[in-house]
Swiss-Prot record:
GO terms for cellular component: cytosol. It comes from the Bacteria. It holds the Pfam family OTCace_N. Heterododecamer (2C3:3R2) of six catalytic PyrB chains organized as two trimers (C3), and six regulatory PyrI chains organized as three dimers (R2). L-aspartate binds at residues 78, 160, 210. It comes from Staphylococcus epidermidis (strain ATCC 12228 / FDA PCI 1200). Coiled coil: none annotated. InterPro entries: Asp/Orn_carbamoyltranf_P-bd (IPR006132), Asp/Orn_carbamoylTrfase (IPR006130), Asp/Orn_carbamoylTrfase_sf (IPR036901), Asp_carbamoyltransf (IPR002082), Asp_carbamoyltransf_Asp/Orn-bd (IPR006131). Its EC number is 2.1.3.2. The lineage of its organism: Bacteria, Bacillati, Bacillota, Bacilli, Bacillales. This is Aspartate carbamoyltransferase catalytic subunit. GO terms for biological process: 'de novo' pyrimidine nucleobase biosynthetic process; 'de novo' UMP biosynthetic process; amino acid metabolic process. Carbamoyl phosphate binds at residues 50-51, 100, 127, 130, 253-254. Belongs to the aspartate/ornithine carbamoyltransferase superfamily. ATCase family. Keywords: Pyrimidine biosynthesis, Transferase.
Amino acid sequence: MEHLLSMEHLSNSEIYDLITIACQFKSGERPLPQFNGQYVSNLFFENSTRTKCSFEMAEQKLGLKLINFETSTSSVKKGESLYDTCKTLESIGVDLLVIRHSQNSYYEELDQLNIPIANAGDGSGQHPTQSLLDIMTIYEEYGSFEGLNILICGDIKNSRVARSNYHSLTSLGANVMFSSPKEWVDNTLEAPYVEIDEVIDKVDIVMLLRVQHERHGISGEANFAAEEYHQQFGLTQARYDKLKEEAIVMHPAPVNRGVEIKSELVEAPKSRIFKQMENGMYLRMAVISALLQ
């Protein structure tokens, strides 16, 4: 695998290969490759806890040496372009770049680089490692994707997770549907929009999305009514109680407790939210291994 940029660039067989490797790392069946003497740099131009820290943990477990990069103290503050920043790191011997950026498809500007890129999120475009860890979590639960009914609720228009998961899960045979306020509908995605209360007792997976305040502008955030949103589109106790016995709840996090999901349900028996985070490290180990081997 040359790069990991978008779920649309991965075949189903490549997806299965990556989650199989990740599951084997997790179970201990597969010995960890050690990339001693190879260097990685994580370039995060947007805030991150889970993605950044799990990439760092994955890199350390694989023996990579981390070249620290902080946007606030870099020449980006002097106007250096993303390409020149990345080309500089390549020139000094970095072997892999992990990049999160607010610009959709930022990687299209980097096609002259000669080292692999792992996309850790581009604007509202794609978040392939999040999608892959979600797929891994679903696979551990169900063993397949064909015919699964998956409801994705929330800020569809601004969510790179919704976009990535829509493409990958439909390709794998799942039935994806959305529930969202009308102002956050994305008409470029062909999944049907439904009322959450009409399907909550029929779905296998409820995937909740964070409200993307940073992409709504000041007026959008000021006019947001958290309790009203929670009652209309969030996972309330009443909705949780209607879920099928074997259904699971997912969220890419960070979670706005009491908005997308009732706080007490974040760690309820059907929740796999922290399992997603655990799987993220193993999945990113699999991605790094595929990019460097």
